[in-house]
Amino acid sequence: MVVVAISGQPGSGKTTVAREVARVLKLPMVSSGSIFRELAAKYGMDLLEFHKYAEQNTEIDKIVDSIALEKAKAGNVVLEGHLTAWIVRPYADVCIYLKASKEVRARRVAMRDGVSFDAALREIEERERLNKKRYLAIYEIDIDNLSIFDLVLDTSYLSINDTVRISLDFICTSLNSKYMKNFC
C-alpha cells in the first residue's frame, strides 16, 4: 500500500506535482488545499478570510487533516497539502517538500489566480504567517523544520516538467527499493 505525501509552500508546485505523480503511479490524489478551499466556499469566505477563521476555530484544520490521515491509513494514495506530510508521516512511504523563493511563488500564484504580483505576495506572506502560528498552536509542528522529509526540492528555477521528473525519479527509486518491485 503506497502512500506518497507532497507538502510545500504556497506556489511551490505541490499540487501540480502531486497530480502528475498520482497519474503516473495510477493512484488517486487527495489535496488538503482543495478540501480547505471547499470548506472556505461552504462557509462563504475567500481563502485568506478562511485562514483567519481557521486560526480561531481549530476544528477546521482537524477536519482537513483527519481526511488526509484516513486516506493515508487506507493506503494507495498521493496526498498533497501544506501540512500533510507532518500529519501522515507514520504512514507515508515517501515525503517530499517543495519550496521556492517568495518572489517566484508570488509570480506563480499571480498567474494562477489572475491577481497582481503584489496581491499574491501579500497573500502568501499572510497565509504563511497564519499557517505557521496555527500549526504550532494546534499540533506543535514547526513548519520550518523539514527534517521529516525524504526530499526537499527548491523549484525556484526548475520547470514544472523538471520538478515532476526529479520528484518521480526519487519516488520511484524509493518505492522500488522499499518494495523490491518496479512501481514506475
From Swiss-Prot:
Top-level taxon in the UniProt lineage: Archaea
UniProt keyword annotations, A-Z: ATP-binding, Cytoplasm, Kinase, Nucleotide-binding, Transferase
Tagged with keyword Transferase: yes
Entry's Gene Ontology molecular function annotations: ATP binding; CMP kinase activity; dCMP kinase activity
Localisation per UniProt entry: Cytoplasm
Keyword Transcription regulation applies: no
Entry EC number(s): 2.7.4.25
Top EC group: transferase
Catalytic activity: CMP + ATP = CDP + ADP; dCMP + ATP = dCDP + ADP
Family: Belongs to the cytidylate kinase family. Type 2 subfamily.
Official protein name in the record: Cytidylate kinase
